[in-house]
């Protein structure tokens, strides 16, 4: 778990949620630097959450953000399992429906931004609704 210095100078532990939120902010900034436009963060629908929703041109990009301290056990990108992909697809389907869209009517893709140690990997179109 990550630590952060406090005003008293002694470090305190970050919760898993705080660590995840911090990496999601990093991913958002990094993607904005690559030209994507922010739409939403931490979108919750029945059964799942999407970390970031961005736009690249006319494409809606659903982004899963992952962080691992090291590549031991496969690193961050390897942690997006089939089960997680299924949840992301279902959540995106519900979000699109709430915004009068569907996979048939909206150009979209699923990306993974994986931070492993100090390295960042952007996997465009990491999976799709046909996976």
Swiss-Prot record:
Positions of region (Disordered): 1-20
SUPFAM superfamilies registered for this protein in UniProt: Restriction endonuclease-like (SSF52980)
GO MF terms, alphabetically ordered: nucleic acid binding
Biased composition (Polar residues): 1-19
Entry-linked InterPro entries: Restrct_endonuc-II-like, tRNA_endonuc-like_dom_sf, UPF0102_YraN-like
Gene3D superfamilies membership: 3.40.1350.10
Superkingdom per UniProt: Bacteria
Family membership: Belongs to the UPF0102 family.
Name under which the protein is recorded: UPF0102 protein YraN
Lineage: Bacteria, Pseudomonadati, Pseudomonadota, Gammaproteobacteria, Enterobacterales
